Swiss-Prot record:
It comes from Desulfitobacterium hafniense (strain DSM 10664 / DCB-2). This is Homoserine O-acetyltransferase. It comes from the Bacteria. The active site is at C142 (acyl-thioester intermediate), H235 (proton acceptor), E237. Pathway: Amino-acid biosynthesis; L-methionine biosynthesis via de novo pathway; O-acetyl-L-homoserine from L-homoserine: step 1/1. Belongs to the MetA family. The lineage of its organism: Bacteria, Bacillati, Bacillota, Clostridia, Eubacteriales.
Amino acid sequence: MPINVPDGLPAAEILTKEDVFIMEEKRAEHQDIRPLSIVILNLMPNKIITETQILRLLGNSPLQVDITLLYPETHRSKNTPEEYLIKYYQTFDSIKDQKFDGMIITGAPIEQMPFEEVDFWPELQKIMDWSKANVFSTLFICWGAQAGLYHFFGVPKYPLPAKMFGVFPHTLNRRDIRLLRGFDDIFYVPHSRHTEVRKEDIVKVPELEILSESEESGVYLVGTKGGRQIFVTGHSEYDPYTLKAEYDRDISYELPINVPQNYYPGDDPRQTPVVRWRGHSNLLFANWLNYYVYQETPYNLEELGNR
């Protein structure tokens, strides 16, 4: 089934060439089925790359999805032109009176800053609080997951001695959770971060449950009971060459960076990267969309405030 995006969105052309079913607004107006409404709060600097990665995964679902793109109005973007944001994105003030089946809050390359020093932190707090009554299920990614765990549950983040950078094996802590349905016993996920949340802090919070972790990269999937909030510390949405682009960028700036682990054959950056996470990423987003949004959300979204 298609995902509905704003007319003319550049990601639509890219994904159409990949045979992802994209439906622009004009065509979607003639559909009789109520699509799922998903709002994506895109905090990444290069919004086009991130929105394309996420839409690719949402478009692999058999469900029809209506997309709203959101950006923090209190942050001035240096990497995405303002006219692009005006054309394709909404601000919180423009959507705060709406309700959504699902929400995705992306990561941001600011994990070394204290949360309170992030210029859009007050706005993000307001959006996260709003989501509790206006969104059925929210998926938090990487820094977004750290921000959500800190804001709602007081879970701190800690600096790492070296950047967690590479593709790491993960295992399941539960097998009877719908989000994990179909996951392999061992599956791989990219990570790219300078900070971490720790198991000993999360297990102290009765509302939270660690669903998956890694001996190398730590806690990966955390959920609230019932799945209204899902926290993902890795980047399963990454394209095959995203880690390469980050590595090449840091090398060009002469920044201290290790070769991403388990990514290049023989850890040799002259080789073509090996993708080990594509199946997992599609399953994670499909399960969230199906089991935690589509099958649970009320048909009348105005009922959300009562749940």
